Amino acid sequence: MIKVKKLLKIIIVAVVLGGLGYAIYDLVRPRETYEIKLWDNIYNGDSIEFFYEEENDLRIEMLRAIYNLDKIAKEDDEIKYILKIVEAAGEIVTLGDVNDTKALNGYDIIRLIGEKKTVSAKDMSIIIRDFITSAGYNARIGEIRCSKKDEDKYDRYYIVEYYSGKYNKWIAIDIVDGGYFTFENTPCSGVELVERKKSELRYIGNMSEEEYFSNKKNLFKSYTIMIDNTVDRIKSNSVITYITSKEEIALTYANESLMPTIYTENTALFTKSPEVELVAEDDKAYIILMKSEEEGVERFVVGGFKDGSIISEYYVGRNDGSFEKVNEYFEVELIKGKNMISISCDGINEDARIEIIYN
């Protein structure tokens, strides 16, 4: 009986100390600068037009000529041919822990790095996108991301998708290992990697499937693509992000500003053919944000988004609830505590609303 009492005391002390330790950690852990209190701003329409580069663009043609991309032997298996193109990029540059060049196309990236020949994952994905474009395929970059805020952990990785005439769908290619994914023996698109359970996916590449997924356990939470996938990106600087949970909505990521982002739960936006013409119209407007790069100021540039582009004229509501007419963009400087932003097309009916807590 004495031993039982001693054991109970030990268990109680352990539980108390464990709870105290977690409470202390919770107090000292850095809080998120911004907390999303409300996001009544999820886009589930179908009126976004995406833009892709033509294979006859001068910089694409330069890549093809300099690196003899048109000499890569065609394969009966389309995916094998694409993987040979990915391999060709890996013979010209190597992936390393370096900063992005900030260039928007593969030709400029390779020119900027000179003899270094080492590029970031983002730059590598741009180069591979343009190499695939040179072969006559529509291609785009995808970013898979996860923010485990409770553990202060951020993780992301890039893939490249090309549109397959054989399968009539987007097919995701891993840029590091040179592999691809399947579900029920059909190649997967980028959004499928996030939409489906990892246990349903197969990976075919140089790594074993087990090794490949071992360091990506908590990664598949959101998927982002550019609206404008051309070499100049002059038609749009916005991205669209498919989320599995509203927990994945963020204004910044790993202390970096995000590009103006439209969040959606509609996977159909990511699966449509590049040849499909835009016919739908949105029935309301949405809020799109971009953090100002000015240091020491918590300021955001805000726009109204409808029918795939920024609205030239609309109404914005702030904390007092009244609407004010604005043109294209306006700036919001956050105050400590709760910040509300809403927009309206007519100045009467609210279309979208977000509430942000600034700590």
Cite the ranges covered by each PLM segment.
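N-terminal Sec-pathway targeting helices
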Residues: 1-17, 23
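Membrane-interface motif at the C-terminal end of an N-terminal transmembrane signal
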Residues: 18-35
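Secondary-structure boundary elements
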Residues: 34-120, 126
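Aromatic/pi-system hotspot detector in well-structured domains
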Residues: 88, 163, 314-315
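Short His-Asn-centered micro-motif
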Residues: 118-121, 142-144
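Hydrophobic/aromatic-rich core segments of domains that either
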Residues: 126-202
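His-Asp-centered catalytic microenvironments across diverse enzyme cores
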Residues: 167-290
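Low-complexity, disordered linker/stalk regions enriched in Pro/Thr/Ser/Gly
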Residues: 238-359
